[in-house]
């Protein structure tokens, strides 16, 4: 299982997600452009002393990622507020790619349009809240996915 961040903007979120990846022995995949330098001290600070243990891969853009990794469609899980299916009902696989967009704009529309049936949402009880912090959403999703395969 892998966590994929497409164009992350806030280093603290990426650092926190990196720490989660270390705790769960998952790969963290970053798709450029990034809103910070991967060597940024704020990324390492959020990941604390664990950042050096993050299994991290980077790709120049979405096409580079898709063409290099060639993930099967059944392993792709896009997380976005417009998802019609709850992340509780997603058919996770052991090789799932849990994919999240940037903090300000989410996943690009062209990515969402490629696989509209692979978009999942974290349910919100209160309609005043449309999304969660990226690191919180990624952590919630990965623990839900691992629940199926733990």
Question: What is the role of each PLM region?
Answer:
Residues 1-150:
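Post-transcriptional modification and biogenesis factors for structured RNAs
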């Amino acid at each position: 299982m892998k966590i994929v961040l497409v164009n992350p903007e806030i280093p603290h979120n990426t650092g926190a997600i990196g720490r989660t990846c270390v705790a769960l022995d998952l790969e963290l995949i970053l798709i450029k452009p990034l809103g910070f330098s991967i060597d940024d001290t704020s990324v390492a600070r959020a990941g604390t002393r664990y950042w050096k243990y993050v299994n991290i891969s980077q790709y120049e853009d979405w096409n580079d990622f898709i063409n290099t990794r060639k993930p099967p469609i059944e392993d792709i899980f896009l997380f976005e507020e417009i998802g019609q299916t709850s992340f509780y009902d997603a058919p996770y696989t052991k090789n799932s790619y849990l994919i999240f967009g940037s903090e300000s704009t989410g996943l690009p529309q062209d990515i969402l349009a490629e696989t509209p049936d692979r978009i999942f949402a974290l349910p919100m009880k209160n309609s005043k809240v449309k999304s969660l912090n990226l690191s919180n959403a990624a952590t919630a999703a990965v623990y839900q996915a691992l629940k199926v395969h733990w």
